[in-house]
Amino acid sequence: MQKKYVVALDQGTTSSRAIVFDHDANIVSVSQREFTQLYPNPGWVEHDPMEIWASQSSVLVEALARAGIHSDEVAAIGITNQRETTVIWEKATGKPIYNAIVWQCRRSAEICEQLKAQGLEEYVRENTGLLLDPYFSGTKIKWILDNVPNAREQADRGELLFGTIDTWLVWKLTEGKVHVTDPTNAARTLLFNIHSLTWDNKLLEALDIPLSMLPDVKPSCSVYGTTRIAGEGSEIQVAGMAGDQQAALFGQLCVEPGMAKNTYGTGCFLLMNTGTKAVRSNHGLLTTVAVGPKGEVNYALEGSVFMGGATIQWLRDELGLIRDASDTEYFASKVADTNGVYLVPAFVGLGAPYWDPNARGALFGLTRGANRNHIIRAALESIAYQSKDLLDAMIKDSGVSLKRLKVDGGAVANDFLMQFQADITDVEVLRPSVCETTALGAAFLAGLAVGFWESVIELEHKACIDKHFIPNIDAQTRVQLYAGWQDAVARTRT
């Protein structure tokens, strides 16, 4: 039977999805299932790895069944995943020894402080591109080994395996035959040397993690093994995987140096491909691994905004100014400007490039004439201002002058926000027709790995732009608006 489809498994923080794409990169079928969030202590976040697998395997079956697709018609399954989340299981039984510790979890902060006290902060920055933070997997692994009964002894005997979610899914799909990750996920563990592209023995020793626990690192665009849907039908190749933000970068076909994408979700994630050069940031950005045009390792600069769509949720849930996120465009467009109002949504501090955990949110410029529309508009503009902060930092670090910014995520449906993003950055903003770019990136990697598609050049002909947003304000206005934002940010930090 002819191979007509590629399936992307998109394993996220709150839900598991399966999306079926045809040869023209159109979405044929989608299935999604949420799973339980566990908060056993303040600042702790966990998932049940078996529930993740159950949700992911069930949506795979559902997505194919809904479209009447037989396993014979599927060329490959690709994977993209929430990054950093940590699973440890028994090699012999496949049984997790503890819940998955989620990327958001802060329980290993003390371990990070111990590593800093050992003078490892600069070594980590130089060799992994990351900061010493509980966000990343390495300290989560150590916490499990130190706190779960018998875990340390089992690890020393070579009986335990570690994986981020991509590794866990491949292990389950291949029925325990394959223990593998890719460079984009390995680069988020705090254990991977992004220059030699190998596990770092010094960091493994510092965290007392046996090398035997770690997966093999295979290219993001390659075949890892085979699976059967619900144990039945023809074997399907499991091929191609990347962490969610790198998958989105590839899904947007940002495969050349200087190409960048911004994902507008609860927060914002801005990544710029820097090619074969790992650029070290002097502005608080992370250096990470990306995927090049032939599936090879490229590098990227990454910055994140803590409060993107979450700012709009605040307007709705806490202030009651809107009923639905989509209302913001209507209200913001009813006024010509914010009437001098700036909202700095530093509700949990400020991320890159400021990294100020003590900053707090504030509204500035309120006068008697300020109304709901001005505040809503200021909230939308704050998302664009924070993204400009990141973009300016990337341009300074990379020395590349950006001309176009590709965008994805839920908030890109807001035309006002996208136009203001173009205006304040003086960069053309491109919104794709298919905004499921994370899943699309996994599908592209899988399809390229098995020859379903021949090259990135072929994929470029399938990538359709829904709308171009062209900068439409003069330079003086842009400078004045941004100066007002910078002043507001400075005042939240004093």
Swiss-Prot record:
Pfam families attached to this UniProt entry: FGGY_C (PF02782), FGGY_N (PF00370)
One GO MF term attached to the UniProt entry: ATP binding
Superkingdom as given in the UniProt entry: Bacteria
Chain positions recorded as glycerol binding sites: R83, E84, Y135, D244, Q245
Pathway terms, separated by semicolons: Polyol metabolism; glycerol degradation via glycerol kinase pathway; sn-glycerol 3-phosphate from glycerol: step 1/1
Enzyme's top EC category: transferase
Entry GO terms, CC: cytosol
Biological processes annotated in GO: glycerol catabolic process; glycerol metabolic process; glycerol-3-phosphate metabolic process
EC number(s) recorded for this UniProt protein: 2.7.1.30
Name of the gene encoding the protein in the UniProt record: glpK
Name the UniProt record assigns to this protein: Glycerol kinase
Family label: Belongs to the FGGY kinase family.
Binding site for sn-glycerol 3-phosphate: T13, R83, E84, Y135, D244
The keyword Transferase is annotated on this UniProt entry: yes
Extent of the signal sequence: none
